[in-house]
Design a protein with these regions (language model features):
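Short, well-formed alpha-helical segments that are part of the catalytic scaffolds
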Residues: 13-37
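A conserved acidic beta->alpha catalytic loop
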Residues: 51-62, 103-107
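Glycine-rich, basic loop-to-helix element that forms the pyrophosphate-binding segment
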Residues: 77-94
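Acidic donor-binding loop at a coil-to-helix junction in glycosyltransferase catalytic cores
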Residues: 194-202
């Protein structure tokens, strides 16, 4: 049974006060309702937000409100160390047995979010997934947003039964609970200092060490979608990360599999010739008013 929980939120240039307030309100209710229980069943919690060297002073100032909330702490760090290192830092700072990692751009969509995790059967790692809004108003407002189109095209993450069929490949490093002892023994690889694929390697590490992942239906919401140009930049950055760690991620990326097929079919040279000629028109289409998921996948 999970009765001590450190909620860990890395952030960068993003005000996440509302997320923290939502989590703190739920945790406070669980804390109060457990007062009458035995000491072994009493719920204890903390919420730690680590700022990974934000450059926007307004977001830093905005997040300082977190320090006024019970059991909450906002940790300001001057140096940007990257997604892996900041998570390892939070794990070391945490004082409780169980860790819940959440990205700062997500939001709580269920009043029973924390309670749902606490009632799950105990597993070394539990992943709850995420979901995006698909109502008519949101679809109309974001119909030209490439990130939204990309996420809408995928349905796998919202279905925990589908995810459980491929527990390591469909694992992400936001909205998951893990034993602190496990993460300290198998930390995030800090060579991943840039964006992308640290969650894939984390899943691979868990599999290699025979650590089970339980997939459950307990999603967080994802509704902050960056612009098309920024999303393309992030995608290119993640592909550079993938190339850098292509040996470590062998068998865990369809892109690597496709690259091997191109080599095997002797199509690598034509692709290397054509891509510089086509990349600018493709980027123009992807950052325009009618981005194509087909062109993005190319």
């Amino acid at each position: 049974m999970i009765n001590t929980l450190s909620i860990l939120i890395p952030t960068y240039n993003n005000v996440c006060v509302e997320l923290v307030k939502s989590l703190q309100a739920q945790a406070s209710l669980l804390y109060s309702s457990s007062d009458s229980l035995s000491s072994s069943s009493h719920f204890e919690y903390e919420i730690l937000v680590a700022d990974d060297g934000s450059t926007d002073e307004r977001t830093i100032e905005g997040n300082r409100i977190i320090n006024t909330l019970p059991h909450c702490r906002y940790i300001e760090r001057k140096e940007n160390v990257g997604r892996a290192a900041i998570r390892n830092f939070l794990a070391r700072e945490a004082k409780y047995t169980w860790l819940l990692f959440i990205d700062s751009n997500m939001n709580v969509i269920s009043h029973q979010y924390l309670a749902n995790y606490l009632k799950e059967k105990e597993s070394d790692v539990v992943y709850g997934g995420y979901q995006i809004k698909r109502d008519a108003e949101t679809r109309e407002r974001l119909k030209y947003n490439l990130r939204y189109i990309f996420e809408s095209a995928g349905t796998q993450n919202g279905n925990h039964l589908q995810r459980q069929a491929h527990p390591y490949a469909d694992f992400h490093t936001s909205n998951f609970i893990v034993k602190r002892s496990i993460l300290l023994k198998h930390p995030f690889d800090e060579w991943f200092s840039h964006y992308g694929y640290e969650d894939v390697l984390c899943g691979k590490t868990l599999k290699d060490n025979h650590i089970p992942i339980l997939h459950v239906d307990n999603p967080l919401g994802y509704e902050h979608f960056i612009g098309n140009m920024s999303f393309l930049y992030k995608t290119e950055e993640s592909l550079r990360t993938l190339y850098q760690f292509r040996n470590e991620l062998q068998g865990y990326s369809k892109i690597i599999d496709y690259a091997h097929k191109l080599k095997r079919w002797h199509l690598y040279p034509p692709c290397q010739y054509l891509f510089p000629l086509l990349s600018l028109p493709i980027k123009a289409r992807l950052t325009g008013n009618k981005p194509s998921i087909f062109m993005f996948n190319i």
